Regions:
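Elongated, amphipathic alpha-helical interaction scaffolds
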Residues: 1-291
């Protein structure tokens, strides 16, 4: 078998490719909202194709039923999703009203934003959790004037079964991912992915998608699994190292923060161990190598 090489830069994901399809996307919307819409013509895709932050890209966004939905797929826990979504939604809304006069006396209407993350990483997480932008504020306030909440759904196989059963594509995606992980423990990753693709096609699990996109799906699956394991290994290695390696991680963190001109974060991190660890986790989740 020829080795499949995948470069470490932004690539499409299986999740994103699946839910670029409007029928799949509407099915996912219905599953989350317990609705039964069928007209995909009313669904307006607003995904930011050029919105890349630290190797990450806005996955899927769309307007439907006067709502602006931002869907993101994550295989690593990222507490900074509210902040990223703030950037995304501001960009999307700016593009929607670019020719409107914000100084006009008439109110400019915009769709209601809603933010969802679909998590399927290997770290144990609750079936559902809420992330808040206010958690990142250096000064806490009971009712902050700017808030943004993100609902995180665990879509690993066996979680949120009501939603999974309502959206066949989402459930089959979870089955596919679980099988790749299972076989990857028994054989080389490339072989595990090939075997999974062959079996899923035979068993009618994402079969149409995999037949049409076999080569790309294999490359993406290898990349996604390898990246997930890479970040997990780095984090565990850092957490379990001794003092010398710990100091090395801290020095690396300080160097990155200085390079990014995040001097306030650097000062805060030197005074707060928990905040220091939070920054390390953030940089790992955003694709920083060798943290």
């Amino acid at each position: 078998m020829n080795e499949v090489k995948v470069q470490r830069n932004y690539k499409d994901s299986i999740f994103r490719m699946l839910f670029k399809d409007k029928e799949n996307l509407l099915s996912l919307y219905n599953a989350l909202n317990q609705t039964d819409y069928t007209d995909v013509d009313g669904l307006e895709i607003t995904t930011l194709e050029n919105a890349i932050y630290m190797n990450y890209k806005n996955d899927v966004s769309f307007v439907f039923d006067f709502e602006l939905m931002l869907y993101e797929h994550q295989s690593t826990v990222n507490p900074n999703m509210p902040l990223r979504d703030l950037f995304y939604v501001a960009d999307i809304l700016q593009k929607r009203i670019h020719d409107r006069d914000l100084y006009d006396s008439n109110l400019i209407s915009v769709p209601l934003p809603r933010f969802v993350v679909f998590y399927n990483g290997i770290d144990s997480q609750p079936e559902r959790q809420t992330l808040r932008l206010s958690n990142a504020y250096e000064k806490k306030q009971e009712n902050p004037e700017l808030e943004l909440t993100v609902t995180v759904y665990n879509i690993n196989l066996g979680c949120n079964e009501e939603i999974m059963n309502a959206c066949r594509t989402l459930k089959e995606y979870a089955m596919y991912v679980e099988r790749v992980r299972t076989y990857a423990k028994q054989m080389p990753l490339a072989e595990a992915v090939e075997k999974t693709v062959d079996e899923c096609i035979a068993e009618e699990i994402l079969s149409d998608f995999l037949r049409k996109n076999r080569a790309e799906a294999i490359k993406m699956s290898i990349y996604e699994y390898d990246e997930e394991l890479h970040f997990k290994t780095l984090f565990e290695r850092g957490r379990e190292t001794g003092l010398e390696q710990g100091e090395s991680r801290i020095n690396k963190l300080n160097s990155i923060l200085i390079h990014m001109d995040r001097l306030d974060d650097l000062k805060h991190a030197t005074q707060d161990k928990a905040y220091q660890e939070q920054l390390m986790a953030e940089l790992l989740s955003e694709g920083m190598q060798d943290m």
